[in-house]
Amino acid sequence: MGSKSSKSSGFENVPSLGLSHTNQPRVSLIREARPSLYGRYNCKCCWFQNKNLVECSDHYLCLKCISSMLRRGQNCEICGKPIPTHIAVTTAPTAPPEP
């Protein structure tokens, strides 16, 4: 309500994502990577994270790397396709169901 600006969120330089358009399909967030025949799934950008991964065409990216790439542009630096910006977060129960 005043002329003072609020705290910086750190996303001032992120390009507009057009979140009002809902025609882009939602990509699911993978909370914990599944083991595979060839080892575990990792973020293809940093090769470290194996939790909170998002599938981008044929590989996975962690949320930190996606945020970093979105600051520089809207296309993935690995495959060149648009970075998924609509993520469906599934809710997991925090406690076992009551008997």
Curated annotation (Swiss-Prot):
Pfam families: zf-P11. It comes from the Viruses. A zinc finger (RING-type) spans 43-79. It is a lipid-anchor. The keyword Lipoprotein applies. A lipid is attached at residue 2 (N-myristoyl glycine). It is found in: Virion; Host cytoplasm, Host perinuclear region; Host cell membrane. InterPro entries: RING_finger_Z_arenaviridae, Z_RING-type_Znf_sf, Z_RING_Znf. GO terms for molecular function: RNA binding; zinc ion binding. Belongs to the arenaviridae Z protein family. This is RING finger protein Z.
